[in-house]
């Protein structure tokens, strides 16, 4: 299961950087002005990635030229090419565009672990208490030596791409946008539920990613949150299109959560929302009545503060390379760098976990799940369950209540619900809103600067709204 989760991280973060975020910084059309020989020299100076010849980059340039000449920009449509906020030289733009295309192809390799263990990607199959793939070296339909070899090759290729493409590209692009090392912070409060248990979910001390609450940037004081604390873990709907029986100022723990629609917004078409009223389909999750940021930056800070040496070394290396102070991590650029840092940590972790799996199989332990709770007859008449993980976008929790064998309540609090939440009963804004305070636009009707910060969170509005 840890291998499947780690694979999702590496896949998701690489795809996010190149296909959902990089083009906020990279001007694709400007890459046509590049000298492929100079791009080749840049590539060879930053990593040993084999696709580095002038001819290779010339071919990429021809592909882009063909798209532009067609008059239909295809995958590169709906952008602000030529915007004055783009600062990369043409040669770095060409480098990034080449890797954008390579990352599309790399997905075929990245997803093999999900396909083998979980049957498909996206949305691989899990089972309660483990994973569905049996282990049998002598079976063609189970996890055997051939499939283990495919998994090992996939891990090696992911590590190579992260080491030789993703991280070098981050460090090649970031120096041109150092002003974003002091923009886009937001809240300064961070939350993680923790991830990658070494033994079981109850022993949080063995998690690779600690369960942590960090308040006001204070890395010297880490609190371990209890997701089932009815006093601290609450959702509010003061500015959401829902209503609670206890009124708009009430906060409810997810076990007692209510989802009753109360749309009071304007009828389309409209140009703006009345933010002093209800204005969002998202609820407002709060920890101790405080808005929190979740996601890669929260996890990197938790690991850094918790003494995880590789995270500390990587973070310090990035800051030193960019000539930035530690405070720079609390920013749009810091959030983007954190995603790369944890991708490197989790890619390396996959190799260690794979080796541990091999040792476990050799010892004769081939169990892949615990089915003790599968029979509903073993359940009490009233039961409450909490499932959690650190999804790539951040802390994810599902709370369910079961009465007489049937679900009587089910509430989800997902990463984007935390980050994109509207104001709460105390008029406290969520992470997205706060991160945009002070943002200035070079071209008001082309809000590239806003996209850079919002995309640094990796939004998923479809995940965040539950109707």
Annotated model-derived regions:
Residues 1-393, 404, 409, 414-467:
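Active-site bordering "gate/hinge" segments
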Residues 398, 403:
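A translation/RNA-centric and nucleic-acid-associated enzymatic feature enriched
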């Amino acid at each position: 299961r840890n291998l499947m989760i780690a694979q999702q991280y590496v896949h998701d973060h690489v795809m996010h950087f190149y296909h959902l975020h990089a083009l906020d910084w990279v001007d694709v059309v400007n890459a046509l002005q590049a000298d492929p020989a100079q791009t080749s020299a840049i590539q060879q100076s930053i990593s040993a990635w084999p696709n580095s010849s002038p001819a290779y980059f010339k071919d990429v340039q021809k592909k882009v030229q063909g798209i532009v000449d067609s008059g239909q920009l295809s995958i590169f449509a709906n952008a602000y090419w030529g915007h004055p906020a783009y600062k990369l030289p043409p040669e770095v733009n060409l480098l990034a565009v080449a890797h954008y295309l390579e990352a599309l192809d790399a997905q075929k390799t990245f997803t093999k672990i999900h396909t083998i263990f979980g049957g498909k990607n996206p949305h691989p199959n899990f089972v309660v208490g483990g994973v569905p793939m049996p282990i049998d070296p002598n079976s063609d339909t189970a996890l055997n030596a051939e499939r283990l070899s495919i998994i090992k090759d996939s891990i090696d290729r992911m590590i190579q791409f992260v080491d030789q493409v993703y991280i070098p590209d981050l460090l090649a692009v970031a120096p041109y946008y150092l002003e974003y090392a002091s923009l886009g912070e937001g809240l300064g409060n961070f939350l993680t539920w923790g991830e990658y248990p070494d033994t079981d979910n109850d022993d949080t001390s063995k998690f690779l990613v600690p369960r942590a609450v960090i308040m006001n940037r204070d890395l010297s004081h880490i609190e371990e949150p209890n997701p089932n604390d009815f006093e601290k873990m609450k959702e509010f709907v003061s500015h959401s299109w829902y209503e609670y029986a206890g009124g708009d100022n009430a906060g409810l723990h997810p076990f007692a959560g209510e989802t009753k629609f109360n749309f009071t917004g304007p009828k389309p078409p409209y140009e703006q929302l009345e933010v002093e009223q209800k204005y969002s389909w998202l609820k407002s999750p709060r920890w101790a009545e405080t808005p929190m940021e979740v996601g890669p930056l929260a996890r990197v800070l938790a690991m850094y503060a918790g003494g995880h040496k590789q995270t500390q070394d990587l973070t310090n290396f990035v800051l030193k390379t960019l000539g930035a102070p530690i405070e720079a991590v609390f920013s749009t650029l810091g959030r983007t760098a954190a995603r790369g840092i944890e991708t490197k940590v989790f890619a390396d972790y996959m190799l260690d976990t794979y080796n541990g799996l091999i040792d476990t199989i050799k010892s004769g332990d081939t169990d892949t799940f615990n089915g003790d709770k599968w029979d509903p007859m073993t359940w009490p008449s009233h039961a409450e369950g909490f499932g959690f993980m650190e999804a790539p976008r951040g802390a994810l929790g599902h709370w369910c209540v079961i009465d007489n064998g049937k679900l009587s309540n089910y509430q989800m609090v997902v990463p984007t619900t935390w980050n994109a939440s509207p104001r709460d009963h105390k008029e406290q804004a969520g992470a997205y809103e706060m991160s945009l305070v002070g943002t200035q636009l070079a071209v008001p009707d082309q809000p590239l600067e806003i996209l850079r910060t919002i995309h640094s969170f990796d939004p998923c509005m479809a995940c965040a709204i539950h109707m």
